[in-house]
Design a protein with these regions (language model features):
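The feature captures the catalytic groove of carbohydrate-active enzymes
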Residues: 154-178, 278, 283-299, 315, ...
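Terminal accessory carbohydrate-recognition/targeting modules of carbohydrate-active enzymes
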Residues: 1-206, 506, 542, 547, ...
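Extended glycan-interaction surfaces of carbohydrate-active proteins
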Residues: 203-241, 267-287, 339-369, 409-492, ...
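Short alpha-helical segments and helix-capping/turn motifs at coil-helix boundaries
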Residues: 147-150, 250-251, 428
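Contiguous N-terminal and early-domain "leader" segments and peripheral loops that mark the onset or edge
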Residues: 75-107, 223-265
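Aromatic-rich carbohydrate-recognition surfaces in CAZymes
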Residues: 242-354, 370-374, 378, 491-507, ...
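Short N-terminal helix-initiation segments at or just after the protein's N-terminus
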Residues: 108, 180-199, 240-249, 380-387, ...
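Extended, well-ordered alpha-helical scaffold segments
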Residues: 178-188, 192, 206-213, 260-273, ...
Length: 573
């Protein structure tokens, strides 16, 4: 693993180890508090005879070894053996840990060969316990905190297997325990990862490197329940975006649904547990707080329907009823609080609400009436109608269909002009001139309602104006606003790729869908599991280790071998 791009971590842990981008330092990180909180807590340096030594890194999914460049027998190796504990073994060298501290952060002796570190900025404590060997601590006190904190483990650095220590994370009090030896501790995390890897879907042989990378990223980006997180949460990344967002979670849940349905449902339930009285889901959540500043598009009923296609476990009546009630409230939020009048469609109050933050339809200002939002809501209400009928709530089933019919009529009346879909700038009730965003083609997802010629025009437009070497550009490459690295102004994104592939398949464009799926799988060989990609070179852009990219790859690869059974087609109307 290249930890300058892909953090070293493990399932359930808030610990991560990375190479810092700006300084090239090796950093131990803590992800509590989400991506607005600083994560660096210690700088690691391999030492020899009291001096920093040149080192190389040998990193697998479960071990990180810091190797003296000129003597490979001298090293420090660590594994994150449990969710809240790091084991480290040092041989023939020393390891210096220098705290990246704030004013009140303080280190104090705790017991024999133990030191407790209070991190005020992270609201956690760390216990350092030396199991074998020696340590030298330098932590001069200055009134209200240590002026600096430096721990040198195995300071003499001349003994083979000379030092073993652990770092434990907790909130309040340390619990005494018996420690495993280093090898056994590491074997435990090895087994956990291998079990996860075995659960990942099989892929065509040429994509095995992508499968292993996607498996590692999805495994290592999970954090355990704490604070606002009522269950295990698959974060979007442990690089910079370490929260769970409320549409990213849908793609990770779909991927997990076949092999780990409980964890899959948890990705949705985290947001249901904090659903506002108005019905809105939080934009994102981490252990410390949740944000309602924005929200995300209403794709959740579609995601749940896809999960049911993959695994009948989700057909349990209690699960269906609980999902229905939450999804109904979420849908009514859009209808009740985001609709300026009965003659208008619901609006996005910011590009972030759509998930397409800087798409060209938002360049004139906000709020915006967008055809993708109407289409998502129409499909969501059609699915809710099917769920209501399944739950023997006939009146509600009829009401959802009537609401979907009404919104569909408004969509075609207000946002379909001259053979194409457009967006409107709501304050002036005018059509937005920028019409080269892929988001305007999203009504393909309700192709089952559209006239066949409209569906055909959408599919043809995708191929003619958006299809590039590796897939669909988010802004047409013919547009003057197109940028190779423009976030939603050109680059390929996994979630919308999957939404369009699914829509194309359901509307009979199987060859086109398969072509896009193959292109995306090839893209991961060129650009890894990045947040988004250059459509022509395949270069990975922005965050290089993203979970929804990994999940979309795993789903597409699985579907290339075995298409999902559509035994719940009725719930898509």
């Amino acid at each position: 693993l290249d930890i300058s791009r892909i953090p070293f971590s493990r399932f359930g842990s808030y610990f991560a180890v990375s190479i810092e981008r700006d300084t090239n330092r090796l950093i131990v990180r803590d992800l509590h508090g989400g991506d607005e909180a600083p994560s660096s807590i210690f700088v690691l340096e391999l030492m020899k005879h009291g001096q920093a030594a040149d080192f190389d890194l040998d990193v697998t999914e479960t071990r990180l070894r810091i190797i003296h460049r000129h003597n490979h027998a001298e090293y420090a190796e660590l594994c994150i053996s449990g969710e809240d504990i790091i084991y480290c073994r040092i041989a023939g060298a020393s390891l210096k840990l220098t705290a990246v501290k704030t004013r009140y952060d303080s280190l104090m002796p705790y017991g024999p060969q133990q030191w407790e570190y209070h991190l005020y900025s992270k609201e956690i404590k760390l216990m350092f316990t030396l199991l074998q060997g020696d340590a030298r601590i330098q932590a001069p006190w200055k009134m209200v905190g240590n002026d600096s904190i430096e721990l040198v483990m195995n300071p003499d650095g001349d003994q083979d297997e000379g030092c073993v220590f652990v770092i434990e994370s907790y909130k309040t009090v340390w619990r005494k325990k018996e420690y495993e030896d280093y090898a056994r501790a590491c074997e435990r995390v090895d087994r956990h990862y291998e079990q996860w890897l075995r659960q990942m879907p099989a892929v065509p042989e040429r994509y095995e490197p992508s499968r292993r990378l996607a498996a590692y990223i999805t495994w290592s980006c999970v954090v355990h329940p704490e604070g606002q997180l009522n269950n295990y949460a698959m974060y979007m990344s442990k690089n910079w975006m370490f929260n769970i967002w409320s549409w990213d979670n849908c793609f990770n849940a779909m991927m997990l649904s076949e092999r780990d349905p409980k964890l899959a449902l948890a990705q949705l339930d985290i947001f249901m547990a904090h659903q506002d009285e108005s019905g809105i889901y939080a934009d994102f959540i981490n252990d410390k707080f949740l944000s309602f500043n924005c929200c995300k598009p209403p794709i959740h009923a579609w995601a749940f329907a896809r999960m049911r296609e993959r695994n009948a476990w989700f057909d349990d009546r209690a699960i269906v009823a609980r999902m229905y009630d939450s999804l109904a409230r979420a849908t009514n939020y859009w209808l009740g609080y985001r609709r300026p009048s009965a003659s208008w469609l619901p609006v996005y109050n910011h590009g972030n609400d759509s998930g397409w933050d800087n798409a060209s339809i938002f360049h004139d200002g906000i709020p915006v009436e967008a055809p993708d939002l109407a289409a998502h809501l129409i499909r969501q209400m059609d699915i809710l109608s099917g769920m209501a009928a399944e739950l023997e709530r006939a009146d509600e089933a009829k009401a959802w269909t009537e609401k979907a019919d009404e919104l569909y009529g408004l969509l075609m009346d207000r946002l379909y002009r001259d053979g194409r879909f457009v967006a409107r700038y709501a304050p002036e009730d005018r059509i937005i001139a920028h019409q080269d965003s892929l988001i305007l083609y999203m009504p393909l997802i309700i192709g089952y309602r559209l006239p066949s010629e409209v569906t055909a025009a959408l599919a043809n437009g995708l191929a003619e104006r958006f299809e590039a070497q590796y897939g669909l550009c988010t802004e047409s490459y013919h547009s003057p606003l197109y940028r190779d690295n423009g976030y939603w102004l050109g680059p390929i994104w996994a979630p919308v790729t999957y939404l369009f592939i699914d829509a194309l398949r359901r509307n009979g464009y199987n060859e086109f869908a398969s072509r896009l799926a193959a292109k995306f799988m090839d893209l991961t060989l060129a650009g890894g599991m990045a947040e988004n990609f250059d459509p022509f070179s395949g270069k990975g852009l922005v965050d290089p280790a993203f979970t929804w990219t990994s999940s979309v790859f795993l789903m597409l690869a699985r579907e290339s071998i075995q298409p999902p059974e559509e035994h719940h087609e009725k719930i898509f109307r």
